[in-house]
């Protein structure tokens, strides 16, 4: 029941067809999620791309995890909440550090009910339907940790964190959106697709997110690009020679 930020064409029929030809699949139970719109919402707003500038809060207006936690841990923590979503909070400095498309979506989200804006933390909380006192206390405590360079939840590189203090304040839903699948076709170092018996499937090559096993069960951020570029080049050369 999770949403996805992938393209409509990413439906996986290729994996089923390759399996029909005898290809082996690995890690098909492993998916990676990022904050995004929860089920029932369609506008994905990104206020979380800089962990030094945002916090996650639950429906009580409280932080519940370090925002730079490993992606699988973050996913499980958010989905364990009663509402199965959290909220991303930034101030105007954080908001303006994002690109124009991210800001545009947030502005649209204020109109559609997918994002909120307030001149104070209390105003923001009221717009969100959260406790004004709780959200104010959460932001104050976070800012105190930034000043002391010691985050209460152990957020790394505390000396690089930014206080959340410049109005207006912004928030959006942070549900879990499927972003990447670690599962896929089993391949070797030559980007050849392997059969269930372990040998190459003649003439079949694969690279990038179509493959599985390259990243284990928890991909590090941005490594998918390296995977696709390196093995895409190898696969292309192999296919040209086949």
Task: Indicate residue ranges for each PLM-predicted region.
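An anion/pyrophosphate-binding glycine-rich loop and adjacent beta-alpha core
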Residues: 15-134
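A glycine-rich dinucleotide-binding beta-alpha-beta segment and adjacent secondary-structure elements
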Residues: 134-218
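Hydrophobic "anchor" residues
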Residues: 63-64, 193, 234
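Glycine-rich phosphate/pyrophosphate-binding beta-alpha loops
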Residues: 33-38, 72-75, 176-182, 210-225
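A conserved FAD-binding loop/helix module that cradles the flavin
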Residues: 1-17, 172, 211-242
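Short Gly/Pro-enriched turn/cap motifs at secondary-structure boundaries
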Residues: 5-8, 44-48, 78-79, 174-177, ...
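Short, ordered coil/turn segments that flank beta-strands lining enzyme active or ligand-binding pockets
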Residues: 59-60, 189, 196, 230
């Amino acid at each position: 029941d999770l949403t996805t930020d992938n393209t409509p064409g990413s439906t996986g029929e290729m994996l089923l067809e390759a399996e029909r030809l005898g290809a082996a699949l690995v890690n098909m139970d492993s998916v990676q999620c990022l904050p995004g719109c929860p089920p029932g919402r369609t506008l994905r707003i990104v206020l979380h791309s800089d962990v030094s500038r945002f916090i996650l809060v639950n429906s009580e207006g409280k932080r519940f995890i370090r925002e730079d936690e490993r992606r699988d841990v973050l996913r499980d923590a958010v989905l364990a909440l009663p509402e199965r979503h959290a909220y991303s909070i930034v101030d105007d400095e954080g908001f303006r550090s994002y690109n124009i498309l991210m800001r545009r979506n947030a502005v649209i989200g204020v109109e559609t009910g997918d994002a909120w804006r307030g001149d104070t933390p209390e105003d923001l909380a009221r717009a969100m339907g959260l406790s004004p006192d709780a959200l104010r206390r959460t932001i104050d405590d976070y800012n105190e940790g930034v000043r002391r360079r010691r985050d209460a939840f152990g957020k790394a590189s505390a000396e690089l964190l930014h206080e959340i203090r410049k109005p207006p304040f912004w928030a959006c839903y942070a549900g879990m959106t499927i972003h990447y699948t670690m599962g896929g076709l089993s391949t070797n170092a030559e980007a050849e697709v392997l059969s269930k018996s372990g040998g190459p499937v003649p003439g079949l090559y694969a690279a990038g997110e179509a493959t599985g096993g390259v990243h284990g069960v928890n991909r590090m951020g941005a490594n998918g690009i390296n995977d696709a570029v390196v093995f895409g080049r190898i696969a292309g050369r192999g296919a040209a020679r086949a």
